[in-house]
């Protein structure tokens, strides 16, 4: 296992220094995949992984589902892929392959939901230093078994919850297909739709908030058979919340 993890660190990182960083934060051996947090502070270690995630996003959102406009570069990125974005990259432990990713964005600045006024139905969308936006969840095609909640998707959700609980983030905003609402509800995320669902590019979408709680983490782990922490934070010293908490609303 240690040898495999050393190989993975070399494959996705930049050398021996990163191998040491990887080994200090290894998930437990029973975890079939590990989820790495990537911020502006440590993204130099994950350039290949991030590039793969942008291409995976393009394949899923633009090529397979026509949910976002196709980009000639073969990469799906937007103005929110900036220094304050937080990425979660899921790698298979046995193959070192990127199998999924998701992105968190702070809500104290302009955020994607502002661009989807029709989907929000005119309701206020919460904004606060302790509220983040959950977006761009994607899983490789051959790991989408067990819909609607496959193992990689569950692993990413658990990793996001682990991170948010550590960082005192207590609420997430997101757009989700209506078909996903029951799984969030069943797993203790307490989804609260902000408006009635709307059809966007042929898919019934709802804007909602979900709570970050230990209960949600426990129930999601139980559903997916995850028995350990999956999150790996390497060379990150800065907190996610850098502003004094206070309630805000979209203007």
Q: Model-found features: residue ranges?
A:
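Charge-rich, low-complexity intrinsically disordered segments
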Residues: 136, 203-251
């Amino acid at each position: 296992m240690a040898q495999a993890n050393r190989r993975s660190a070399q494959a996705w990182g930049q050398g021996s220094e990163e191998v040491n960083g990887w080994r200090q934060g290894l998930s437990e051996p029973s975890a079939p995949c590990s989820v790495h947090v990537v911020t502006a502070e440590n993204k130099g270690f994950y350039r290949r992984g991030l590039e793969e995630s942008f291409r995976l996003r393009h394949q899923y959102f633009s090529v397979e589902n026509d949910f976002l406009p196709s980009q000639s570069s073969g990469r799906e990125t937007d103005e929110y892929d900036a220094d304050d974005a937080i990425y979660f990259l899921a790698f298979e432990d046995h193959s070192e392959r990127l199998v999924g990713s998701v992105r968190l964005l702070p809500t104290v600045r302009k955020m994607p939901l502002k661009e989807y006024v029709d989907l929000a139905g005119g309701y206020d969308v919460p904004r606060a230093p302790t509220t983040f936006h959950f977006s761009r969840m994607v899983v490789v095609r051959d790991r989408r078994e067990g819909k609607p909640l496959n193992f990689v998707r569950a692993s990413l959700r658990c990793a996001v919850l682990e991170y948010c609980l550590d960082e005192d983030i207590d609420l997430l905003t997101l757009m989700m297909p209506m078909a996903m609402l029951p799984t969030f509800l069943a797993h203790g995320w307490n989804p609260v739709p902000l408006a009635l669902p709307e059809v966007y590019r042929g898919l019934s979408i709802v804007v909602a908030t979900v709570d970050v709680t230990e209960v949600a983490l426990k129930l999601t782990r139980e559903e997916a058979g995850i028995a350990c922490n999956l999150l790996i934070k390497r060379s990150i010293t800065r907190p996610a919340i850098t502003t004094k908490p206070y309630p805000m609303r979209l203007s």
